[in-house]
A protein has these predicted regions:
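Short Pro/Gly-enriched beta-strand edge/turn motifs at strand-loop
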Residues: 4, 27-35, 154-159, 179-181
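Conserved beta-strand hairpin/beta-sheet module of binuclear metal-dependent hydrolase folds
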Residues: 23-80, 197-214
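Residue-level signal for inorganic ion chemistry
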Residues: 29, 258, 283, 338
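Active-site HxH/HxHxD metal-binding segment of metal-dependent hydrolases
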Residues: 43, 65-70, 76-177, 204
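Metallo-beta-lactamase
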Residues: 57, 64-67, 156-161, 165-168, ...
Length: 347
């Protein structure tokens, strides 16, 4: 299925030219602004300002932390006749640095409250324990020794996460405290356990963070350990998007965390579900081939299965660090979802 067409020509052009798009009005009282991810313009993230009927503002995803984060926000606010003191709420869709990073800086500068899902807050609190457990995952995957140090550094105990304590914990269905707005939190686990989308039904907008993007297939399980399978969570969250959308003029406009705004939430969610089904089949086919070739031999490792899969762009051996770790974790989750994880090596 082709990628959805962009609603914003400005954002589409910035994506094409690898430049940073300017502040843009999405609807009356709603603006998008962009920020670099570290020093990189490519892959920039979006924040969204939403104005309440009393003149207060909510900020959805403050973006990457850095010396220019608050001055950039302050300049954007001035351009729409607001100031930092108008900001009363910072909503975090998920715990990644390109979305959450500047939350503390913005809170200190404005006095705004920071809100996130309770599971994201819990993941931040237990990041040390999760990192140690992830080190054990790396060992179990069976990657070559020369790759394991980078895997631990990027996925396990060496991975950096911010220390942010929220003022307000959100749950599925909660209405955000923005005057005159019906902004509703929708819990969409998968990318991370406490990922949130925010729906504005009156203006037919949905802010999707990294849950649904127009061309990128979002990673899963990237927010700490969970008792459930992140893949199964992700699929359920994608399917939950479909009934939110409507055909024609009442369709939701998707305001994602990256790339560009678009219409076609239901179709894009269904395409992502289909993509995951293809990946599950790829993993099962690779496992079957390895077991057929090695009948009576030791069970294959996660790395061996992933290396045999055909869906990786450039092949598994082209990956290192975090990207490789994510691929290996996803391989295991696909096999777990298919009921085949017990056929993998466990040590």
């Amino acid at each position: 299925m082709p990628a959805p067409a962009p609603i914003s020509s400005v954002q589409a052009e910035a994506l094409r030219t690898r430049s940073l798009p300017p502040l843009e009005e999405v609807r009356h009282g709603v603006w998008s602004l962009s920020s670099t991810v570290g020093d990189r313009v490519e892959g920039h993230s979006f924040s969204y300002l939403v104005e309440g009927s009393d003149g207060s503002l909510a900020l959805i995803d403050p973006g990457w932390a850095g010396p220019d984060a608050v001055p950039r926000l302050e300049a954007a606010l001035r351009s729409v006749d607001h100031e930092l003191s108008d900001l009363t709420l910072v909503v975090v869709t998920h715990l990644h640095l390109d979305h959450l990073g500047a939350a503390d800086d913005v809170r200190r500068a404005s006095g705004a409250r920071v809100a996130m899902h309770a599971l994201e807050s819990a993941a931040l609190d237990r990041r040390a324990a999760d990192g140690a457990a992830a080190d054990a995952d790396v060992a179990r995957w069976g990657a070559p020794r020369e790759l394991t140090e980078a895997l631990v550094a990027s996925w396990g105990s060496g991975r950096a996460l911010p220390a942010v304590t929220p003022d307000l914990l959100l749950a599925d269905g909660d209405e955000l405290p923005v005057a005159g707005r019906r902004l509703r939190a929708v819990h969409t686990p998968g990318h991370t356990a406490g990922h949130l989308c925010v729906v504005e039904p009156e203006q037919r907008l949905v802010f999707t963070g990294d849950h649904v993007l127009p061309t990128i297939n979002p990673g899963i399980g990237l927010g700490g350990r969970t008792a459930s399978n992140p893949l199964d969570d992700h699929l359920a969250s994608l399917r939950a998007m479909v009934p939110l959308d409507r055909p024609g003029a009442d369709a939701l406009e998707v305001c994602p965390g990256h790339e560009y705004r678009f219409v076609g939430l239901a179709e894009r969610a269904e395409a992502l579900v289909a993509h995951r089904a293809d990946r599950t089949l790829d993993a099962v086919t690779a496992l079957d081939a390895l077991r057929a070739e090695g009948a009576g031999a030791a069970s294959p490792t996660v790395f061996e299965v992933a290396e045999r899969m055909t869906g990786w762009r450039g092949g598994l051996r082209s990956m290192t660090g975090f990207v490789l770790a994510s691929a290996l974790a996803q391989t295991e989750w696909h096999l777990r979802s298919a009921g085949r994880a017990d056929e993998l090596a466990t040590d």
